Every structure is written in structure tokens, then in C-alpha cells.
Amino acid sequence: MAQSTMQHFIEQANHYGKQRTPFFFLIDFEKEKPLICPLENSAQQGIYFDILGKRNCTISPRPLPLNFTKHPMPFSHYQQGFKLVQSELQKGNSYLLNLTYPTEISGNLSLEQIFHQTNAPYKLWLQDQFVCFSPECFVNIHDNNIFTYPMKGTINATLPDAENQLLTNEKEQREHYTIVDLMRNDLSMVAEHIQVKKFRYIDRIKTQKGKILQTSSEIYGKLNENWQNQIGDILATLLPAGSISGAPKEKTTQIIQQAEKQKRGYYTGIFGIFDGKTLQSAVAIRFISQVDEKFYFHSGGGITIHSNAQDEYEELLEKVYLPIEGAD
């Protein structure tokens, strides 16, 4: 599939939308190499997806004994980026920033096997490049309504009183309020009558090591009739996703580039499908990239002025997991 500029992507998406032509799309975090193609051509271009049960391939889990080892970056390396972020937070240039790094992993799974075996509502495998098994919606659109479900806050479900711990944690509360406020503001740029329909509800996610709890909220807005005609503009206006950048978005994104020292690429970008009537899309988190023969699991977390470097480093590593169907 040919990569395009963001302007070409917007024009192509608007064109497909006007024609009500189903299409697949993938946009990287930096908005430098967006991909778009008619849905019917996606598989022959090495793109395989399973998005809320809509898929262009046969999902065939082949249970294998799991051999999955993390090779974490040194804490001192993480601390360098964390200190830079804290300096910017102290100056007031950001008040929430999502800091991410890759962790090298080794195991007996290929990208294809991970795609088939993981359990997630939004899955994508781009041949020889990456696999993504995301729990997080970006936006879903149907019946002229647009929905987003920002996800912020996680805890190990096996901890005593885990749900109450998560819901009453002040740092998690502050982060979640910030992201909900940011996403309300984002939706107001493309829609009207914005409402928070559900605030900080709990999702339970299975992993190969047990269960984790995550908090999300549901935000809703009303789009104009024939929103399909501006589908490219709507997506571009909302990028990057607030939950994986921070607030304020533009300045925070600049700080992210300084702290992480490498481009994220398709990690923390978005992907999705337009089926001719509705749109479903996801934030590309829970993401494993392949570079030559090496595999990297990309993860991160929200940093505020109250964050502790050791805690955040451990959270980054805690998120390096595979949500395997049937795990205890």
C-alpha cells in the first residue's frame, strides 16, 4: 500500500466517504505516513484486522506454550526522559504527558501468531512490521453520533481491594479528569451537544499472567448530516489521540519528541475501518514492532508533576503483556 501525505489522506478519505466506499485507514503518531485503501483490497496488501468482530481474515488461534521474556531498558535511561518531562511540567508547559519507550522481548511467537492468539476488541497485523491488540477505542461513529472512550488508569486485579484502590487513587483521578476534559474539547471541534455519558467505569482485561483493571469514560457528541463527506477532516482534527499525548496537546507532543528521542511511528497512532455507513477506530496501543529479527513491545504511562520515576518505570513494564484468550 502506498503511503501518502496527510493532505492526500484527508482528500482520499473524504472522497471514499462521499462515495460511501468502505475503506481501511492507519495513521502514525507523527502524521507522516498515513495509509488508506478500499476495504476489499486490504488483505492483498498485507493488512489484516479484526475490529469489533469485523475482520478481513479467518482468526485461527493455535494455542502454544507461551515463552515470553522481557529485556527492560535500564532505569537510568528511563530516568533521563522522565527528568526532562518533569522539568517541562514544573515550567507549566504541560500538565499531563504520556511517556513511552520500547521494551525488547523474546519468545516463541511470531507477529502472525500474536495476532491470532491475543484477545482484544481492536486487532491489526501489518505484515513484517507490527501487530497491535488494542483495548482502546479512538472514535466510533454511527447514526450521526460520535463516541470516544478515553482509557486512563490501570491496576493489577489481584491486589487487595484493587477496584477501590484504582477508583480512589488521587493521581489516577487527576489524570482521568484531565483526559476526559481534553477529549470533550476535542470532540467539540467536530461535533455539538457534547456529553460525558459514563465517567470512570471499570474494564477487566485478561493477560497471560492474570487480570488487570482499567478505568474508561464514555463521551458523546452529535455530528452534522453527511458527516461521511468530511470523514478525513474529522479524523485529522482529532489527532493525535489525547490519551497517548497529553495536555495541552501541541506543546506536550513537542516535549514527547524531545524526551523519547525517536519517532513512535504507527505506535499510538490510530487505525480503523469505514464500512460505508459507520466508522470504528482504535488507538494503536498494546503494540509489538518487528525490526529485523528483534521484537519490541511499546508501552508507557501518563506523567504528572506528582509522578514518581520508579513507579512509572514499573508501570511501563507492567503493561508489557499479552491478553491471551482463556488466561486465568
UniProtKB/Swiss-Prot annotation:
Protein name stated in the entry: Uncharacterized PabA-like protein HI_1170
Pfam families linked: Chorismate_bind
Lineage of the organism: Bacteria, Pseudomonadati, Pseudomonadota, Gammaproteobacteria, Pasteurellales
Residue spans crossing the bilayer: none
Origin superkingdom: Bacteria
GO biological process, one term: L-tryptophan biosynthetic process
GO function term, MF aspect, one: 4-amino-4-deoxychorismate synthase activity
Similarity remark: To the C-terminal of para-aminobenzoate synthase component I.
